[in-house]
Amino acid sequence: MKTLNFCLFLVIISSLTVRVFCLNDRFLTVNDNYVICLYINKSFVNCENLCKAYMNAKDGFCRQPHCFCTDVE
């Protein structure tokens, strides 16, 4: 029983820590708008400025380690 509980504990912890939206840069559609998901494996990245400067997007938000650029033209 202890082994089963330990295995269940490991599965729950791994499912919480391994959530990844995208491993590579890819386009997504959210409410009929194109959104690009950038994989940025660095801390302290300003996603809003990155999206506006390099992706010609109107806005961007961060969900580490990803930047989501919205309204990409």
From Swiss-Prot:
Expressed by the venom gland. InterPro entries: LCN-type_CS_alpha_beta_dom, Scorpion_toxin-like_sf. It comes from the Eukaryota. Disulfide bonds join 37-62, 47-67, 51-69. GO terms for molecular function: ion channel inhibitor activity; sodium channel regulator activity; toxin activity. PROSITE patterns: LCN_CSAB (PS51863). Gene3D superfamilies: Knottin, scorpion toxin-like. It is found in: Secreted. Keywords: Disulfide bond, Ion channel impairing toxin, Neurotoxin, Secreted, Signal, Toxin, Voltage-gated sodium channel impairing toxin. GO terms for cellular component: extracellular region. SUPFAM superfamilies: Scorpion toxin-like. Residues 24-73 form the LCN-type CS-alpha/beta domain. Putative sodium channel toxin. This is Putative sodium channel toxin Ts39. It comes from Tityus serrulatus.
